[in-house]
């Protein structure tokens, strides 16, 4: 969606879920545009005078490369940059990059994502076609090897 849609949602008192696609309104990298969208949403929320705190979530495809299987699925075909396209003849959209790297590199990359820093919640998109067992591995790898360093989860959890 657009920044205007996020502002509209804030005025109505709705929480914001911003996924991996938004209108390309400035030509800047996806994470910067999404962070600006979140800031516009929060400002509109404050101006509307709502009494509760809003919730904002963003979605990301994040894969910690832990073994040969991870490298086979995500290591060589990493989409390390945003993609741009048109939803219709007037609407230019930007699709956020995927993150796939060894945990230490992944942490460095994720710390630079402004929208992740602005959000209250991070939703992980997982490749459900690869099955429950593999997706449990993907999520566990993030929880154990990335989340503690990002401050998302207690190291002892």
Label each residue range with its predicted role:
Residues 1-157:
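Active-site-adjacent structural elements that line small-molecule/cofactor binding pockets in enzymes
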């Amino acid at each position: 969606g657009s920044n205007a849609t996020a502002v509209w949602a804030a005025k109505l008192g709705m929480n914001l879920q911003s996924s991996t696609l938004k209108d390309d309104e400035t030509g800047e990298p996806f994470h910067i545009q999404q962070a600006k969208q979140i800031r516009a949403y929060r400002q509109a929320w404050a101006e509307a005078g709502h009494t509760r705190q809003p919730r904002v979530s963003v979605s990301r495809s994040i894969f910690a490369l832990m073994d040969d299987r991870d490298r086979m699925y995500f290591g060589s075909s990493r989409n390390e940059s945003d993609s741009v396209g048109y939803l219709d003849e007037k609407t230019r959209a930007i699709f956020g990059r995927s993150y796939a790297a060894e945990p230490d590199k992944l942490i460095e990359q994720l710390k630079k994502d402004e929208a992740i820093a602005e959000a209250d919640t991070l939703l992980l998109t997982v490749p459900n076609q690869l099955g429950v067992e593999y997706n449990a591995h993907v999520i566990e790898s993030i929880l154990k090897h990335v989340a503690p360093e990002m401050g998302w989860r207690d190291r002892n959890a």
